[in-house]
Regions:
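Aromatic- and kink-enriched transmembrane "portal" helix at the membrane-lumen/periplasm boundary
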Residues: 1-4, 30-55, 89, 93
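Membrane-interfacial segments
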Residues: 15-23, 67-71, 114-119, 153, ...
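Perimembrane helix-loop-helix junctions
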Residues: 101-136
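Juxtamembrane membrane-water interface segments immediately following transmembrane helices
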Residues: 139-206
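Membrane-interface alpha helices of multi-pass inner-membrane proteins
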Residues: 80-95, 139-146
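Specific aromatic-rich, kink-prone transmembrane helix
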Residues: 10-13, 51-71, 86-88, 105-106, ...
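Transmembrane-helix signature of polytopic, membrane-embedded enzymes
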Residues: 6-37, 53-54, 72-79
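Short hydrophobic alpha-helices at membrane interfaces in multi-pass membrane enzymes
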Residues: 23-25, 66-89, 125-133
Length: 206
């Protein structure tokens, strides 16, 4: 909950150039802080489903903070770009369905580039364009560093077993073994495992 509150505070600061009144920003802060994602039952435990909404919100706040400052000095937006890049990398690492982040990031970048090149009054366009590479570099660099750590200790340049093709193939084969025994929230139920133990000595060792 503390991380979600911090993300809300970053959003509050990010909107300052476009929301001048304190009451307006306070309203956005309160509505965001008490959104169902912050107190839903499945997000009250300290694990990835708890921090994922916070990281996505922090990424959104970082991009908004950078984009709403496109008329100010380029370096004023740098902290927000850094926050966006780091939070995107962290969000990408803690969920398997991270591809859902791509449309959000691509749309945000497209809108920013459209304003940057179509608005003739914006100065330092090259500097602003270069700053857009900061979150992308932190995003990709964070993922690469994590994969590199896995390679160093486990010999696999992957994010996790869940993202490896071998794991997905194995779990897919196990889940398809006895389709009539499938249960909700149980990928390989006990009845399926017991049946597989009889025909697979290797699986039985697990």
């Amino acid at each position: 909950q503390a991380l979600f509150a911090v993300s809300c505070l970053v959003l509050l600061a990010a909107l300052k150039p476009v929301m001048r009144t304190n009451w307006g920003r306070l309203f956005v802060f309160a509505v965001t802080l008490y959104t169902p994602a912050s107190w839903a039952e499945n997000t009250l435990r300290v694990y990835r489903d708890n921090i994922y909404p916070s990281l996505v919100l922090l990424a959104l706040a970082g991009l908004l903070g950078a984009f709403t400052r496109f008329r100010e000095k380029p370096l004023r937006a740098l902290p927000y770009y850094v926050a966006a890049g780091l939070s995107l990398a962290a969000a990408w690492l803690c969920h398997e369905d991270n591809a859902l982040l791509l449309p959000f990031v691509l749309c945000a970048a497209a809108v920013y580039l459209a304003y940057l090149f179509l608005d003739k009054s914006i100065a330092h366009k090259k500097s602003r364009l270069a700053l857009l590479l900061v979150p992308l570099a932190l995003w990709g660099g964070g993922i690469a560093a994590w994969c590199g750590m896995n390679y160093k200790y486990y010999g696999r340049f992957i994010i996790s077993d869940f993202t490896s093709s071998e794991f997905n193939d194995a779990m897919g084969a196990l889940s398809r073994a006895y389709p009539d025994d499938q249960k909700r929230y149980e990928l390989v139920p006990l009845s399926t495992r017991l049946a597989l133990y009889e025909v697979s000595p290797t699986f039985a060792k697990l």
